[in-house]
Amino acid sequence: AGACLKHYCCNGNEKYRFVGDSIVSKRALSEIYLRNFEYAVRVGHPYAVMTAYNQVNHVFCSENAYLLKDKLRDEFGFQGLVMTDWGGTHDKVEALQNGLNLEMPGCTVHNVRIVKEAVEQGNLKEEELNEAILPMLEVAKWTEKKEKVGERNRFHRCHARDPGIAFL
């Protein structure tokens, strides 16, 4: 199991969360709004980051190359997958090009067609699509079962038993 950080970033206005646009300087963004995400990525190594619905400086979070590539991936060193909140994608092709890996709640036939047509028309490079897919494969590898469940349960029973004996 792994953690998913949300909602990346500047998600502070629930009333206008789907249409809001947080206009913020790069300095304030780094010093105030991104600092906790950076710490969580560097220390906690989450499996996923979920984008917020809102825009930051006129670009939706799910399509924001500055937030997803420059800051999250390049500066913070995030290696997991970036996903939208439910219905949080506005331009599927732009989102894939700018750092999104997974659209929630899932991929419909309509969305597959949009991506396929973008590749066929040269609007989305195959390399960009591969780059979007690789983090999902990495997370899948991280979650592979490494031990038998029974062995893990026996380990936990032993460790739970020992402190319990002290209270008897």
Task: Tell me the role of every PLM-derived stretch.
Residues A1-L168:
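Glycoside hydrolase catalytic-domain context in secreted enzymes
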